[in-house]
Design a protein with these regions (language model features):
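Short acidic, gly/pro-rich beta-turn/loop elements at beta-sheet edges
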Residues: 16, 41, 57
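C-terminal structural segments of small proteins and small subunits
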Residues: 51-86
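Short amphipathic alpha-helix segments
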Residues: 11-28
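Solvent-exposed beta-strand motifs enriched in subsets of small alpha/beta binding domains
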Residues: 2-8, 43-48
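Short loop/turn and capping residues at structural boundaries
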Residues: 25, 32-33, 70-72
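Amphipathic, hydrophobic secondary-structure cores in small proteins
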Residues: 28-49
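Helix N-cap motif at beta-to-alpha junctions
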Residues: 10-13, 48-55
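Structural motif
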Residues: 4, 29-30, 68
Length: 86
């Protein structure tokens, strides 16, 4: 199963989103530093979660500014990220 990365503007926003996802049943939700190949604005934080959480995130992110949502695919030794924000 693929995972998603939700890029947010601060560690506080990332922590709040991860807690919301865990309360909603996604026990995989956790805060990570945004991978360097995705971080467009220097140091940022993301929430890594299960792919099933994408609709919950898009509909329940009140008060949390989301920069982008990516799906992570692992091909061999490499990780590829696809923007699914829209």
């Amino acid at each position: 199963m693929a995972e998603i990365l939700v890029e947010v503007g601060s560690i506080t926003s990332a922590t709040r989103l991860a807690k919301r996802l865990k309360r909603a049943g996604d026990q995989k939700a956790r805060v990570i530093s945004t991978p360097s190949e995705l971080g467009k604005s220097g140091c940022s934080y993301s929430v890594k979660a299960s792919e099933e959480s994408v609709n919950f995130i898009k509909n329940n992110h009140q008060g949390i500014s989301i920069k982008a949502i990516y799906i992570e695919k692992i091909k061999g030794e490499e990780r590829e990220y696809y923007d699914i924000s829209r």
